[in-house]
């Protein structure tokens, strides 16, 4: 097997079980020229075995699969998937009567860097974020079938937009197990008893933003009798929770017509009336907020897409978060509540909080932090990989 030899002193992060080997840590490669996605072994400059993982050209040269000396075979994949499954059993998600959508594998958080698997009812949706995981998808599918048995009827690969295209992989989304009878239409799932249509074929990510489940439940608690504005609403997750929590009215805003069509279907699916309980606005969320009447909304949800996907975009992202949150804090009704989020991994909790602080100071209003929010337990953070805590949120009480 090909060996990756590290520069002197660069083994320390691996000895602390961090799962990434950066290109700058590599001294030389022995035993041949690895192809992208190959399993390679990693050694210290002194010859000490450190782990094995998937090789890839780029800033992260190796993503560690195991710190033990073992073969990455069908049994390895079964153990890995079964470990993730058992963790979701512990969380009460597997077999739940009121929640049928959850994350089964969360990359580094489940010790499988580069792999995401979400469960929607009887379908698993797989996303590979590395060449190695993409090339391992058939073995992963077999492991999923072994773990779930007859409860799993289909596996959909949605790696076309996430796997590294420069690796020359044959990327094409599609079913790798089960019939394509579902086509491109949406399938209904439950989340805390709320019904949602999920389209994993055409939707963003794997079809739904599962990482906001706990935060949506908190919105429900604050919504009774309130006029609610949900910005960047996608398919209306927060909107449905607000309605089910007894909101007087909910307005949802997103620039995607497809997303707004799905919002309206979800509203009807849950027994509410479009135009009565809920109103959809297909337009730019920031422009909508700029022109909306101040004091109209008791509760606002501000959940934009990632403003920064690499460190070079950090400063611009922080300015954008400040502008956006200043608008929300300025416009919300006195005594109102703002739920605000960032899903940008490169924007840490401190930077996000500083951007929101600057926004509040700009408005001159009195603002208190009621909650600090993060991702749910089925999006776990590997304690040795703190970068995995990407979702951060604040709940603000604005006087």
Describe each PLM feature range.
Residues 1-121:
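Non-catalytic accessory regions of SAM-dependent methyltransferases
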Residues 105-118, 134-209:
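Non-catalytic substrate-recognition/targeting regions of SAM-dependent transferases
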Residues 225-234:
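Conserved class I S-adenosyl-L-methionine
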Residues 235-248:
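Conserved SAM-binding loop of SAM-dependent methyltransferases across substrates and taxa
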Residues 249-254:
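Conserved SAM-binding motif I beta-strand of class I
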Residues 258-301:
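S-adenosyl-L-methionine
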Residues 296, 337-399:
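C-terminal catalytic and target-recognition region of SAM-dependent MTase-like enzymes
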Residues 298-327:
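Mobile active-site "lid"/loop adjacent to the S-adenosyl-L-methionine
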